[in-house]
Amino acid sequence: MGNPARKFSKARRDSRRAQTFKLSLPGMVECPNCHEMKLAHRVCKKCGYYKGKEIVAVEK
């Protein structure tokens, strides 16, 4: 197996590793019923609707 020719500094090593562990924002979309931002493919926490149907009864 090949060995590194010279030592990588900790900063260079860490900056290289950081590229593979980037955090991405979750997919947020606007609820078509109440126009609040919600996670995609999930029931809206504000109104309880998903795909035009009331899934969860929310007290108003």
Curated annotation (Swiss-Prot):
Any Pfam family: Ribosomal_L32p
Database matches in SUPFAM superfamilies: Zn-binding ribosomal proteins
GO BP of this protein: translation
Any GO CC annotation of this UniProt entry: large ribosomal subunit
GO MF: structural constituent of ribosome
Residues making up the signal peptide according to the UniProt record: none
Source organism, top-level taxon: Bacteria
Keywords (A to Z) from UniProt: Ribonucleoprotein, Ribosomal protein
Family as reported in the entry's similarity comment: Belongs to the bacterial ribosomal protein bL32 family.
NCBIfam families per UniProt: rpmF_bact
PANTHER family from the UniProt entry: 50S RIBOSOMAL PROTEIN L32 (PTHR35534), LARGE RIBOSOMAL SUBUNIT PROTEIN BL32 (PTHR35534:SF1)
Protein name: Large ribosomal subunit protein bL32
